């Protein structure tokens, strides 16, 4: 099988990120961090602006730091030389931020929502992305949703096999009531319909020597940061 509707993939060896102090003004930044995805943030000292692509929560970070992965948009408005956020710099967002932990208040546009680490806050990781598409897998047309997988959180020399984990499950009328007969205008629990096969995928990484591929469709391989192969078939 192969791609039917791409589904294109891309490898980013420098997935820029900035690490934040986990709490700001007594509130865990994780309480509202997900709201930052898709917004623009600005360093209030550096003037650097970036688009937020994804968030890594402290419990998922190998360093224990809340980390924001970004695409830098603008450099400093003063000398156009700064390309990354400063250490110990407050960041602001171009949208209002709310959270139950903020009580009845919110963080207004342009007001600081977080503080970068005091040392080496700006880092680079690596990532692999797949776009929305349809793949022909195991005799079926399978929808694949856009997903970005972080390869190394704070490193730019990853070595992995990258691909889709294929999950198959049988959906019965007990799990999905819409499978019951509805010819009378309602779901008839006394007349369950046939079971359905559901195939879903998720983007995963494997070590280079892991060839247990029973539920794995390889899309590409990176070795010491270099993209070696991009599979065209699944």
Place the predicted regions along the sequence by residue:
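Subunit-assembly interface segments of extracellular/virion macromolecular structures
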Residues: 1-234
């Amino acid at each position: 099988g192969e791609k039917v509707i791409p589904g294109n993939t891309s490898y980013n060896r420098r997935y820029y990120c900035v690490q934040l102090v986990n709490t700001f003004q007594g509130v865990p930044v994780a309480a509202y961090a997900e709201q930052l995805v898709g917004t623009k943030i600005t360093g209030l000292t550096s003037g650097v602006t970036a688009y937020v692509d994804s968030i890594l929560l402290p419990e998922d970070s190998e360093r224990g730091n809340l980390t924001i992965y970004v695409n830098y948009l603008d450099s400093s408005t003063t000398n156009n030389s700064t390309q990354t956020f400063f250490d110990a710099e407050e960041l602001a967002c171009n949208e209002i931020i709310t959270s139950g932990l903020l009580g009845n208040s919110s963080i207004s546009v342009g007001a600081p929502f977080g503080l970068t680490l005091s040392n080496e806050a700006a880092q680079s990781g690596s990532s692999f992305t797949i776009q929305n598409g349809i793949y022909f897998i195991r005799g079926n047309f399978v929808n694949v949703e856009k997903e970005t997988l972080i390869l190394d959180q704070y490193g730019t020399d990853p070595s992995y096999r990258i691909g889709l984990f294929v999950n198959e499950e049988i959906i019965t009328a007990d799990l999905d009531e819409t499978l019951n007969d509805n010819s009378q205008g309602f779901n008839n629990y006394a007349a369950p319909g046939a079971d359905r096969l559901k195939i879903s995928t998720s983007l995963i990484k494997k070590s280079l020597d892991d060839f247990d591929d029973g539920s794995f469709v390889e899309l590409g391989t990176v070795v010491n940061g270099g993209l070696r192969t991009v599979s065209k078939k699944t």
